[in-house]
């Protein structure tokens, strides 16, 4: 569960290390985002010579959350930290690699590029 002001790790090689959620997209009163939801983020930490700089504003899709995800078969999955992948205006990943596992709920949200780049889909 991600809300405004939440800090997330970045799970790609776009150059950002940590981002902060500044808006949850999808309705004027929407407050909370989960896995597969698109949010607007500000880059808080970045590596030198990366594609993005500190202070840049981008869209991002959430790929891992510390709050467990319940599945229809009764299982649940959770991670140690929250993580996101930065997107451009066309909702395509900025980076060319994805680090760490992602959940298969992204497939239903049509993020096939992220699914194919990820080393593991849980």
Swiss-Prot record:
CDD domains: Ribosomal_uL14 (cd00337). Coiled coil: none annotated. GO terms for cellular component: cytosolic large ribosomal subunit. One of its GO terms (molecular function) is structural constituent of ribosome. SUPFAM superfamilies: Ribosomal protein L14. It comes from the Bacteria. Disulfide bonds: none annotated. One of its GO terms (biological process) is translation. Signal peptide: none annotated. Keywords: Ribonucleoprotein, Ribosomal protein, RNA-binding, rRNA-binding. Pfam families: Ribosomal_L14. NCBIfam families: rplN_bact. Binds to 23S rRNA. Forms part of two intersubunit bridges in the 70S ribosome. Belongs to the universal ribosomal protein uL14 family. Part of the 50S ribosomal subunit. Forms a cluster with proteins L3 and L19. In the 70S ribosome, L14 and L19 interact and together make contacts with the 16S rRNA in bridges B5 and B8. This is Large ribosomal subunit protein uL14. It comes from Rhodospirillum rubrum (strain ATCC 11170 / ATH 1.1.1 / DSM 467 / LMG 4362 / NCIMB 8255 / S1). The lineage of its organism: Bacteria, Pseudomonadati, Pseudomonadota, Alphaproteobacteria, Rhodospirillales.
């Amino acid at each position: 569960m991600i809300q405004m002001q939440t800090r997330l790790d970045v799970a790609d090689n776009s150059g950002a290390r940590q981002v902060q959620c500044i808006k949850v997209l999808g309705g004027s009163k929407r407050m909370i985002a989960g896995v597969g939801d698109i949010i607007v983020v500000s880059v808080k930490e970045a590596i030198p010579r990366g594609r993005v700089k500190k202070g840049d504003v981008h869209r991002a899709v959430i790929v891992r959350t510390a709050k467990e995800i319940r599945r229809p078969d009764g299982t649940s999955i959770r991670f140690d930290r929250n993580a996101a992948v930065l997107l451009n205006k066309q909702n395509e990943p900025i980076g060319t690699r994805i680090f760490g596992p992602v959940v298969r709920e992204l497939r239903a949200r049509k993020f096939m590029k992220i699914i194919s780049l990820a080393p593991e889909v849980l």
